[in-house]
């Protein structure tokens, strides 16, 4: 069996020699062309002219054949040159790994680190640190992400030239890994890993801190600090609540529609008020819609929505009914006015008001006016005001005004109690303006907190026997605070001529849990037994209702990570949302 051996050096030398031969032949052909392709006739007779033309035609044919031969020659030279390069590249690729291993072996054996090459990346979910890059050239490996509760791995460091590896992201509730240091002479520091999100708990789990950015070397920029993890939501407080749900009061009926004739569509009926404890007010009925197809000068108005019913103690008010919409098709000189949304019902003690109804939309009229949103219902004692309704929109037509959003309801005053004054309810949000034109409604004012009540006086016993004792109602438990967002990682230091990395942004605070509400006071105690014909004892005074549980405050946003020495400080995390107001508790035990 024979083997073919290719020597790139010999092939390249042969290609060079062939190129030289081609150049010599081309030069000779060019010199002969001037002498042979245009032979002059020796005399003016026909024979001399024919002989000169014959020699000239032979010379021109030779030049054409020489040009084709030169093109083939050039193709052969190019093929040999390309083949020589391909063989040389293949030999270099085959020799490269062995050569790099031979160069790295002494440094690896002596220092445990190669001279040239990139560090290995940490495996995901292990928190493994990234490997360091080569001492001379190489980037650090990226750190592996952490499992739940496990910090992310640190990024590997570079050597003399190279970039530091990025830190791995922290698992749930754990910190992100730090970015690797850049090359000593030149390179960029690795970015810190992001902190893990908080784990839910009684006080809301803290989000993990973002990893610090890696420092730069002599030239280069430090890495950015990682973003802190978001805190987890706090656990809701225990709320005794009612034993069985109470059916809401009856809703109002919708208004009658108006078709093809001018006028106003029927208005919606008002919702019924809640009468029992915990019974929500009924929603108001929607106003009737109006429409016409064709006609001249027809003016129509949508029906107004019905008002929402007031809620019973501890129950929200009903939502106001929406205003009726008006749609004109093919009408000339018509006027379309949307119905106004109705006011939401007021909330019962400790409950929010109902939302205002939305204004009716209009379309197709020559002049269009959308309906206004209704005002939100006022909150009961300690309850939040209801949001205002959205203003109606003008969907089509040449001229029109969108409706204004309704004002939010006022928050209720705080509950007066023996120990803690109730927190005023939050005013409702104003409704949005119309799609094209219209102003949003103003938000309702927050309710005033109640003044702390004085301690209750002791009950007087009956003449015959002692009066019945008053049981102390149990208030709702306090909700846990939302988790604090994780701190952003510090920005990495810069090189002498580089820039510092910016600190990572703080994580968002967790959402606070909802507070429980206090129970209703117990019934009065029975009079004592009569001894020696004494006067019957008076019934004991019913116990005061328990203080409503305070809604949990939203968790504080995580502080922004510190920047480098001259870097920008990271932005603070967003504050968590306030906890929702607790519902009314169970009745207290009788005295």
Swiss-Prot record:
<comment type="similarity">
    <text>Belongs to the mycobacterial PE family. PGRS subfamily.</text>
</comment>
<dbReference type="Pfam" id="PF00934">
    <property type="entry name" value="PE"/>
</dbReference>
<feature type="compositionally biased region" description="Gly residues">
    <location>
        <begin position="579"/>
        <end position="591"/>
    </location>
</feature>
<feature type="compositionally biased region" description="Gly residues">
    <location>
        <begin position="539"/>
        <end position="567"/>
    </location>
</feature>
<feature type="domain" description="PE">
    <location>
        <begin position="1"/>
        <end position="93"/>
    </location>
</feature>
<dbReference type="GO" id="GO:0044165">
    <property type="term" value="C:host cell endoplasmic reticulum"/>
</dbReference>
<feature type="region of interest" description="Disordered">
    <location>
        <begin position="539"/>
        <end position="591"/>
    </location>
</feature>
<dbReference type="InterPro" id="IPR048996">
    <property type="entry name" value="PGRS_rpt"/>
</dbReference>
<keyword id="KW-1038">Host endoplasmic reticulum</keyword>
<feature type="region of interest" description="Disordered">
    <location>
        <begin position="468"/>
        <end position="491"/>
    </location>
</feature>
<feature type="compositionally biased region" description="Gly residues">
    <location>
        <begin position="371"/>
        <end position="412"/>
    </location>
</feature>
<feature type="compositionally biased region" description="Gly residues">
    <location>
        <begin position="477"/>
        <end position="491"/>
    </location>
</feature>
<comment type="function">
    <text>Involved in endoplasmic reticulum (ER) stress-mediated apoptosis through human Toll-like receptor 4 (TLR4) signaling pathway. Localizes to the host ER, leading to ER stress, disruption of intracellular Ca(2+) homeostasis and increase of nitric oxide (NO) and reactive oxygen species (ROS) levels. Stress response results in caspase-8 activation and apoptosis of macrophage cells. Apoptosis may lead to dissemination of the bacteria, thereby spreading the disease.</text>
</comment>
<feature type="compositionally biased region" description="Gly residues">
    <location>
        <begin position="303"/>
        <end position="324"/>
    </location>
</feature>
<dbReference type="Pfam" id="PF21526">
    <property type="entry name" value="PGRS"/>
</dbReference>
<comment type="subunit">
    <text>Interacts with human TLR4.</text>
</comment>
<feature type="compositionally biased region" description="Gly residues">
    <location>
        <begin position="336"/>
        <end position="363"/>
    </location>
</feature>
<feature type="region of interest" description="Disordered">
    <location>
        <begin position="303"/>
        <end position="412"/>
    </location>
</feature>
<feature type="region of interest" description="PGRS">
    <location>
        <begin position="94"/>
        <end position="591"/>
    </location>
</feature>
<keyword id="KW-0843">Virulence</keyword>
<protein>
    <recommendedName>
        <fullName>PE-PGRS family protein PE_PGRS5</fullName>
    </recommendedName>
</protein>
<dbReference type="InterPro" id="IPR000084">
    <property type="entry name" value="PE-PGRS_N"/>
</dbReference>
């Amino acid at each position: 069996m024979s083997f073919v051996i290719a020597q790139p050096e010999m092939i390249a030398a042969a290609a060079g020699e062939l190129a030289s031969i081609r150049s010599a032949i081309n030069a000779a052909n060019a010199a002969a062309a001037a002498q042979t392709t245009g032979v002059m006739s020796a005399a003016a007779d026909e024979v001399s002219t024919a002989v000169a033309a014959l020699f000239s035609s032979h010379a021109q044919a030779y030049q054409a054949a020489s040009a084709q031969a030169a093109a083939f020659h050039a193709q052969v030279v190019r093929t040999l040159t390309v083949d020589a390069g391909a063989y040389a590249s293949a030999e270099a690729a085959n020799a490269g790994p062995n050569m790099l291993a031979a160069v790295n072996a002494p440094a690896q054996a002596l220092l445990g680190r190669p001279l040239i090459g990139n560090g290995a990346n940490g495996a995901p979910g292990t928190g493994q640190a990234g490997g360091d890059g080569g001492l001379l050239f190489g980037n650090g490996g990226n750190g592996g992400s952490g499992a739940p509760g496990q910090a992310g791995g640190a990024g590997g460091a570079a050597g003399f030239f190279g970039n530091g590896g990025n830190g791995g992201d922290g698992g749930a509730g754990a910190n992100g890994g730090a970015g690797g240091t850049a090359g000593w002479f030149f390179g960029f520091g690795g970015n810190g890993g992001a902190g893990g999100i908080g784990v839910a708990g009684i006080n809301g789990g803290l989000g993990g801190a973002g990893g610090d950015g890696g420092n730069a070397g002599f030239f280069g920029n430090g890495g950015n600090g990682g973003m802190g993890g978001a805190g987890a939501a706090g656990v809701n407080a225990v709320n005794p609540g009612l034993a069985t749900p109470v059916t809401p009061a009856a809703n109002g009926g919708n208004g009658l529609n108006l078709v093809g004739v001018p006028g106003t569509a029927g208005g919606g009926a008002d919702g019924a008020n809640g009468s029992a404890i915990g019974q929500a007010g009924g929603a108001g009925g929607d106003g009737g819609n109006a429409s016409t197809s064709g006609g001249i000068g027809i003016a129509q108005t949508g029906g107004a929505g019905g008002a929402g019913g007031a809620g019973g103690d501890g129950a929200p008010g009903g939502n106001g009914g929406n205003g009726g919409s008006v749609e004109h098709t093919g009408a000339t000189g018509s006027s379309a006015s949307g119905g106004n949304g109705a006011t939401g019902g007021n909330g019962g003690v400790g409950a929010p008001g109902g939302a205002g109804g939305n204004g009716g939309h209009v379309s197709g009229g020559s002049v269009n006016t959308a309906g206004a949103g209704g005002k939100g219902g006022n909150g009961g004692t300690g309850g939040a005001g209801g949001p205002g309704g959205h203003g109606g929109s003008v969907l089509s037509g040449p001229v029109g005004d969108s409706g204004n959003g309704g004002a939010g309801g006022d928050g209720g005053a705080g509950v007066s109690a023996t120990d803690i004054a109730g927190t005023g309810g939050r005013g409702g949000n104003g409704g949005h303006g119309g799609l094209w034109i219209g102003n949003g409604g103003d938000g309702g004012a927050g309710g005033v907190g109640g003044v702390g009540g004085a301690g209750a006086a002791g009950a007087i016993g009956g003449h015959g026997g002692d009066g019945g004792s008053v049981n102390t109602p149990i208030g709702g438990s306090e909700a846990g605070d939302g988790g604090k967002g994780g701190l952003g990682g510090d920005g990495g230091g810069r090189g002498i001529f580089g820039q510092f990395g910016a600190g990572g942004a703080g994580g968002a605070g967790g959402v606070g849990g909802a507070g429980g509400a206090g129970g209703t006071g117990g019934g009065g105690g029975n009079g004592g037994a009569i001894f020696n014909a004494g006067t019957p004892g008076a019934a004991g005074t019913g116990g005061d209702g328990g203080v409503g549980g305070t809604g949990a405050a939203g968790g504080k946003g995580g502080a922004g990570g510190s920047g480098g020495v001259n870097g920008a400080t990271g932005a603070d995390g967003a504050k968590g949302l306030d906890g929702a107001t607790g519902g009314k508790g169970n009745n207290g035990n009788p005295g």
